[in-house]
Amino acid sequence: MPHFPPTPLTLHIATNADTLATWLIPAIAPVIKSHLVEINLLIEGEARTINRLKDGQAFGAISVQATPIKGCQLTRLGCVDYLLVASAEFSRHYFPNGICADSLKKAPGIAFDHKDNMHTRYIQQHFGLAQGECPLHAVRSSDAFVTMAKHGAAYCLVPKTQIKPELASGELVHICKEHIITETLYWHHWMLLKGVYKDVSDAIIAHAQAVLD
């Protein structure tokens, strides 16, 4: 039987929504089950999670930042491929002749929030459209991205691992196969972790390195 302290310990972890929707919970679930802890997940864009670690709100952060911050360590977790997807119906309606700059000016996309620049960077880099030239919903949920796309309400960038069943069934289609975004994730955390902090950190690293490329 696990030995529990008299009161739960709160662990604050900064993560992006895509990681939360895919592999983070399976990674930390064994530690949650074997220790009396309360997990507080601080959701930010993958480029901004590191700020929660810098200001002391979290003991660890999953981030795309490849350089360590003062007083912390980092470990490479792996790579995530992002695909631009939509429902077949949406694709036929907005992109009957393929995706292009003119069609993107009418087709609604999705971003996490107004600070999330992954979608706008992708559209600008590959189609030459600046921020504000395309309609864009703000939805702070990776699962809701997929739901909106499946209902034909928008197109979006999502991790390939999150939508394997939908791609296999044809419920979602990859609408821009020539351009894939690959993001490398890193785990930043306090130095010299002990106890359950180290257990959570080790679990995140081991699971991520097993499931990510």
What positions do the PLM features span?
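A late-sequence structural motif
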Residues: 23, 175-213
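Short, hydrophobic alpha-helical packing/hinge segments within bilobed ligand-binding/sensory domains
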Residues: 48-50, 144-146, 163
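Central regulatory/effector-binding core of bacterial HTH transcription factors
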Residues: 6-70
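Phosphate- and divalent-cation-binding pockets in alpha/beta enzyme and binding domains
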Residues: 22-23, 52, 118-122, 165-166
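Paired acidic/hydrophobic, glycine-rich loop segments that form the ligand-binding mouth/hinge
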Residues: 59-63, 154-158, 175
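Immediate post-signal peptide segment of exported/extracytoplasmic ligand-binding proteins
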Residues: 2-11, 102-106
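C-terminal regulatory
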Residues: 74-81, 85-153, 168-179, 209-213
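Beta->alpha turn/N-cap motifs
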Residues: 45-46, 63-68, 87-88, 141, ...
